[in-house]
Design a protein with these regions (language model features):
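Walker B catalytic acidic pair
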Residues: 144-146
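Structural recognition of the conserved hydrophobic beta-strand(s) that form the central parallel beta-sheet
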Residues: 167-173
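Conserved short hydrophobic beta-strand within the ABC ATPase nucleotide-binding domain
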Residues: 185-187
Length: 204
């Protein structure tokens, strides 16, 4: 839709600001609960560098107060009005925000090693699992061929964390990648056929 008058945008700006302020506040609230769990898990998996999450916003100093965020969105929209009209898109609001993963003083993207990236990804998954569990849900933990990507130290830490889950599904391409410390039923899948195997059985 092409607006020929900036006056037509006022009502839309208010809607974006009101709902946007609430969304940003809710995200920050969720992040305040999620990040400590994520950091603790990452420390258990890899203690080399501290990991943390930064909320990158299109407004300055977003808070958990929806009204404050809405006011800042409206103020920012006034500044970017000409650019928005020229480009045909809204440059301020929660749709422009992002979460940045940090490892020490660097962004994970473009800096973290393969092992560190896997540790970060696992920490995010496990933190999500624990947060859902904390809210009274009973999630299932699914780990898809992760042990082959980790060094021995990280494998040991992940095994300890996996044991705390009520129900876990783990897939591996090679049976030896599945740690012997983990108990439970094991199945071999080939060409769409599923067969149960013993813990000590060798898959050929």
């Amino acid at each position: 839709m092409l607006f020929r008058s900036t006056e037509s945008l006022v009502a839309w700006d208010e809607q974006v600001a009101n709902f946007g302020g609430e969304i940003i506040a809710a995200r920050l609230q969720a992040l305040s609960e999620f990040e400590p769990i994520f950091q603790e898990i990452y420390r258990d998996i890899s203690s080399e560098k501290p990991a943390f999450i930064t909320y990158k916003s299109s407004i300055e100093e977003p808070t958990q107060n929806p009204l404050e965020n809405s006011t800042k969105i409206l103020e920012r929209m006034k500044v970017t009005r000409a650019s928005e009209i020229e480009r045909g898109l809204t440059l301020t609001g929660p749709h422009r925000d992002d979460l940045l993963l940090n490892l020490g003083d660097h962004l994970v993207k473009g800096y973290a090693s393969h092992g560190e990236s896997w540790s970060i990804a696992l920490s995010l998954k496990l933190a999500t699992y624990q947060l859902l569990e904390k809210d009274g849900l009973k999630p299932i933990l699914i780990l898809d061929d992760v042990f082959s990507e980790l060094d021995e130290e990280r494998r040991v830490h992940l095994i300890k964390l996996a044991k705390t889950a009520q129900q876990t599904f783990i897939t591996v391409a090679v049976e030896n990648d599945l740690p012997k410390e983990l108990s439970g039923d094991r199945f071999f899948v080939k060409s769409g056929q599923v067969s149960k195997i013993s813990k000590s059985a060798e898959v050929k």
